[in-house]
């Protein structure tokens, strides 16, 4: 199964801006690896909350549409809220 997430590049980084994103219903994330420079991104929480329940989500390539360009990634790590059904942050690795 293929998964697609639409994302935007983040201009602000840090704890305060990440908290503002989460309150706005977005998830801060980063894409890194493969000798490329790390890219900070953000996307809607609802675009990942349901698809992350599938087991193959963590083992398959995911397409991120980042500012109009398609990027193939894999989930490296995901931080979840302690008791709420919320994703706090996602680390993606270039596929």
Swiss-Prot record:
Keyword Hydrolase: no
A GO molecular function held by the record: structural constituent of ribosome
Entries under Pfam families matching the protein: Ribosomal_L25p (PF01386)
Alphabetical UniProt keywords: Ribonucleoprotein, Ribosomal protein, RNA-binding, rRNA-binding
Record GO cellular component, one term: cytosolic large ribosomal subunit
Gene3D superfamilies for the chain: Ribosomal Protein L25, Chain P (2.40.240.10)
Family the entry assigns: Belongs to the bacterial ribosomal protein bL25 family.
Primary role: This is one of the proteins that binds to the 5S RNA in the ribosome where it forms part of the central protuberance.
Name of the protein in its database record: Large ribosomal subunit protein bL25
Species: Shewanella loihica (strain ATCC BAA-1088 / PV-4)
Lineage of origin: Bacteria, Pseudomonadati, Pseudomonadota, Gammaproteobacteria, Alteromonadales
């Amino acid at each position: 199964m293929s998964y697609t997430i639409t994302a935007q590049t983040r201009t602000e980084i840090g704890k305060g801006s990440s908290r503002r994103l989460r309150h706005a219903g977005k998830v801060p994330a980063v894409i890194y690896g493969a000798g490329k420079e790390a890219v900070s991104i953000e996307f809607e929480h609802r675009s990942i909350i349901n698809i992350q329940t599938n087991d193959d989500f963590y083992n398959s390539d995911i397409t991120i549409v980042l500012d109009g360009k398609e990027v193939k990634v894999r989930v490296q790590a995901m931080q979840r809220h302690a008791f709420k059904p919320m994703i706090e942050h996602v680390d993606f690795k270039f596929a």
